[in-house]
Amino acid sequence: MSKSTATAQNLSFVLEGIHQVKFEDRPIPELKDPHDVLVNVKFTGICGSDVHYWEHGSIGQFVVKGPMVLGHESSGVISKVGSAVTGLKVGDRVAMEPGIPCRRCEPCKAGKYNLCEKMAFAATPPYDGTLAKFYVLPEDFCYKLPDNISLQEGALMEPLGVAVHIVKQASVTPGQSVIVFGAGPVGLLCCAVAKAFGAAKIIAVDIQKARLDFAKKYAATSTFEPAKVSAVDNADRLRKENNLGVGADVVIDASGAEPSVHTGIHVLRPGGTYVQGGMGRSEIMFPIMAACTKELAIKGSFRYGSGDYNLAVGLVASGKVNVKDLITGVVEFHDAEQAFKEVKAGKGIKTLIAGIQD
């Protein structure tokens, strides 16, 4: 794999097959619409989906059939603007929302553009991602960063947008008790957003003690490590140890693990709300009797939608959510493959890949 960046115009980190990646110099993308902008990508976070494509070549129905640039959690600096762009100028620092909907279908017109069937989402086959020197986006999918948000923090607006959408789906209100299963980046950010929304109790659940220790220092009011017992027994212990009475108001699953789903359903109070944010196996066993007899409100959550990125930026700018502490490593662009290996091995919380240096 070549590591030369000295003469590259648009060096890109390209997935060619399972565990097969290369650096490839590609043409600088053209602005195809007068509302487009060209972004010089400065930082990109490594997401679990990127690692999954690298390791397996597919996620569900999305199969990598040809070379694809990885990456979608990015920030950058505006390098060029289209003739109709009014809200941004060259030199502006932006967070990049990496999914472009059709804007015309029923979900788009209803304000749920994250459900658009024609969504062109970065690093989701067949669309290239943002691990390149340059990337083109419509101006309204770039969010200008205030002076008190760094470009490194700007790259975390993507996972924070995911967490914002999940917590909004849960309709978290002040004083509620919220249990978050999975203390990875999205789960931790769900804890932080729930705290910003006024939740009184925020309980992080994970099987890794190191993650729980971080969660307690970060945003959780308490933590819970499940025992190797039934979901009902773990739910009972969760309630008792955290004085939850008949159960929690809200459960968010950011793990996708079947045991977490089961425990989450059982630990909710009657009439509680369950939101599935993590994706695991496409089909699992589900405690439907408990869900029905407790009249639970059960929702899914997918990516982010209208207003989520703006709220994410606002939460960080106001100091209500801290994303800086999640950044545990920054590597140079030519070390991208090694960074993927370290993320796969579970090292750190959020690793960023720096953009190509001029």
UniProtKB/Swiss-Prot annotation:
SUPFAM superfamilies the record matches: GroES-like, NAD(P)-binding Rossmann-fold domains
KW NAD (keyword) present: yes
Cofactor remark: Binds 1 zinc ion per subunit.
The enzyme's E.C. designation: 1.1.1.9
Keyword terms of this UniProt record: Carbohydrate metabolism, Metal-binding, NAD, Oxidoreductase, Xylose metabolism, Zinc
GO biological process, one term: sorbitol catabolic process
Residue sites binding NAD(+) per the record: 182-187
GO terms of molecular function: D-xylulose reductase activity; L-iditol 2-dehydrogenase (NAD+) activity; zinc ion binding
Gene3D superfamilies per UniProt: Medium-chain alcohol dehydrogenases, catalytic domain, NAD(P)-binding Rossmann-like Domain
Pfam families: ADH_N (PF08240), ADH_zinc_N (PF00107)
Stored PROSITE patterns: ADH_ZINC
Domain of life: Eukaryota
Pathway: Carbohydrate degradation; L-arabinose degradation via L-arabinitol; D-xylulose 5-phosphate from L-arabinose (fungal route): step 4/5
InterPro entries cross-referenced by the UniProt entry: ADH-like_C, ADH-like_N, ADH_Zn_CS, GroES-like_sf, NAD(P)-bd_dom_sf, PKS_ER, SDH-like
Obligatory cofactor(s): Zn(2+)
SMART domains listed in its UniProt record: PKS_ER
Binding of Zn(2+), residues: 47, 72-73
Function statement: Xylitol dehydrogenase which catalyzes the conversion of xylitol to D-xylulose. Xylose is a major component of hemicelluloses such as xylan. Most fungi utilize D-xylose via three enzymatic reactions, xylose reductase (XR), xylitol dehydrogenase (XDH), and xylulokinase, to form xylulose 5-phosphate, which enters pentose phosphate pathway.
Family: Belongs to the zinc-containing alcohol dehydrogenase family.
Name assigned to this protein: Probable D-xylulose reductase A
Organism: Aspergillus fumigatus (strain ATCC MYA-4609 / CBS 101355 / FGSC A1100 / Af293) (Neosartorya fumigata)
